[in-house]
Curated annotation (Swiss-Prot):
This is Probable protein kinase UbiB. SUPFAM superfamilies: Protein kinase-like (PK-like). The active site is at D289 (proton acceptor). It is an enzyme of class 2 (transferase). Keywords: ATP-binding, Cell inner membrane, Cell membrane, Kinase, Membrane, Nucleotide-binding, Transferase, Transmembrane, Transmembrane helix, Ubiquinone biosynthesis. The chain crosses the membrane at residues 24-44, 493-513, 515-535.
Length: 537
């Protein structure tokens, strides 16, 4: 094992030298003296050298490709962190392709039989040995079940965990060294990024997780004209094997075929936006790997086109609070209400509470005003979020993994939509959806539902408060004093409930203000009830 680690280290060193990645480190102006002096000990730096023909981003991309699948996938993850990376490097890393030679089909057959506990011929009436596709984590074979259904069988690449563990160890080592060596590197939080990648890559190795994600997404879009998700055959799914319905559609980037079948491209682009916002705001569960290779278009109704989504290994979700703040942020942003945007970032806890609103507002205005000089159809929604996050990072915004996934997905959807229909006005498509969603959240039905959910917790709240007070009570508290202390606990619980109602009413009223609409009667009812519970004796 140690010999393999040494060989891997030498391999990494050769790639660093070949693409002169040492320049990326030594161009940093704030290196410690001892590290800056190391360049003198690198023999290749004393040799004559030609001017570098490739940019730093291109050299980094080629180096990651040379280092293999694990580094390629890490580069793909890095490309989504546009809030942290320089634009030229992020653009280059977007070009990384996760394509590797297929592994021996006999290994795939052996793994399937081991996982299913049956021979391939006993499960499938046909199994294509030649894979349909091969990537760093798994490869896919076509097959037919004994019952006649056409399926695809996804199989995890054998012997992958030791390779991943070894490469992750080197990535962590490089990240820690970079953090110690450079102030700029520390700002990028490389150790945190590698940690996120570690979780993502190990999640992708568990195909039962992917099957569960696909099953959830399919249920969310059951009967929808917007998107179709293939059926999962749960009785044939295992941690290293996934069996799904085989779909036949047109790759979303095959513009010629889409045109030949007279696909309504405008509707297709707009439905892509609707799919995104439906997942994020209605379901709070979104496919977070919607690059063109994972999206197809049904051939059934080209005049009413439907998307087909595959590969649900990476998904994201938002809390109700994040959904609410995100919707308000976007609406306020397009109203150019920068103070509201700044205040929402602080209220949500995305930036520290001590942040000066005026300074944050000015920074947002400086970054965002130039964007609005363009026509709305030319404004990139994803770029807006990216610039917003970049600005917030300067004010110590904590990394929000769910928002990073959201921004990456939005950039993919937006880029795809404009490729399908260049005049796509994403904001005009999204605004009615957001405003409708906000109105539904303030509707009497939604408010009553929230109150009902809170009411279920009331008995427990009083008991918890009373228990807390009793634990904090004096050791000499006698039995005669306990009833009074219990009464005080009940009163405190009611005051807490009142505070919650006040907060809920204020949130509803604020939502009405965001939409320039009158506050609904439930908001006033909640405010009045909350005030009564707080001031009552």
């Amino acid at each position: 094992m140690k010999l393999l680690a040494v060989r891997r280290l030498l391999r990494i060193q050769r790639v660093v030298i070949r693409y002169r990645l040492d320049d990326l480190l030594f161009e940093q102006p704030l290196l410690p003296w001892w590290l800056a002096s190391l360049r003198l000990l690198m023999p290749w730096r004393w040799l004559p050298r030609k001017p570098l023909a490739l940019s730093r981003g291109a050299r980094l991309r080629l180096a990651l490709q040379d280092l293999g699948p694990i580094f390629i996938k890490f580069g793909q993850l890095l490309s989504t962190r546009r809030d942290l990376l320089p634009t030229d490097i992020a653009d280059e890393l977007m070009l990384l392709q996760d394509r590797v030679p297929p592994f021996d089909p006999q290994h795939a057959v052996a793994l399937i039989e081991e996982q299913l506990g049956a021979k391939v011929g006993e499960v499938f009436s046909r199994f294509d040995v030649e894979p349909l596709a091969s990537a760093s984590v798994a490869q896919v074979h076509a097959a037919r079940l004994k019952s006649g259904e056409e399926v695809v069988v996804k199989v995890v690449r054998p012997g992958l965990k030791p390779v991943i563990a070894q490469d992750l160890a080197w990535l962590f080592l490089i990240a820690k060294a970079a953090e110690r060596a450079s102030a700029d590197a520390r700002r990028l939080h490389p150790v945190e990024i590698v940690g996120d990648y570690e979780k993502t890559i190990y999640d992708e190795l568990d195909l039962l997780r992917e099957a569960a994600n696909a099953s959830q997404l399919r249920r969310n879009f059951e009967g929808s004209e917007l998107m179709y998700v293939p059926q999962v055959y749960w009785d044939l799914c295992r941690p290293k094997v996934l069996v799904m319905e085989r779909i036949y559609g047109v790759p979303v980037t095959d513009m010629a075929t889409l045109a030949d079948q007279r696909t309504d491209m405008k509707m297709l682009a707009e439905r892509g936006v609707e799919v995104f916002f439906t997942q994020v705001f209605r379901d709070s569960f979104f496919h977070a790997d919607m690059h063109p290779g994972n999206i197809f278009v049904s051939t059934v109704k080209p005049w009413s086109p439907q998307y087909i989504a595959i590969d649900c290994g990476i998904v994201g979700s938002l809390t109700a609070e994040d959904q609410d703040y995100l919707a308000r942020n976007l609406i306020a942003f397009f109203k150019r209400d920068y103070r509201r945007v700044a205040q929402l970032h602080i209220d949500s806890g995305w930036v520290p509470a001590q942040t000066k609103v005026n300074e944050f507002e000015a920074a947002i205005r400086t970054v965002c005003e130039p964007i609005f000089e363009k026509p709305l159809k030319d404004i990139s929604f994803g770029q807006v979020l990216m610039r917003l996050f970049q600005t917030a990072r300067r004010f110590n915004m904590e990394v929000q993994p769910q928002l990073v996934l959201l921004q990456k997905t939005l950039l993919n959807i937006e880029g795809l939509g404009r490729q399908l229909y260049p005049d796509l006005d994403l904001w005009s498509t999204a605004k009615p959806f957001l405003e409708r969603w906000m109105r539904e959240r303030m509707s009497p039905k939604a408010v009553i539902g929230n109150l009902y959910n809170q009411a279920e917790q009331l008995p427990h709240l009083a008991d918890m408060t009373r228990d807390l007070l009793e634990r904090l009570s004096q050791p000499h508290l006698n039995d005669a004093q306990l009833p009074e202390r219990r009464r005080q606990g009940d009163n405190w619980a009611l005051r807490l409930l009142g505070a919650g109602l006040l907060g809920g009413g204020a949130t509803l009223a604020a939502g009405a203000v965001s939409l320039s609409a009158p506050a609904a009667w439930p908001a006033w009812l909640m405010l009045a009830a909350g005030l009564y519970l707080i001031v009552r004796r």
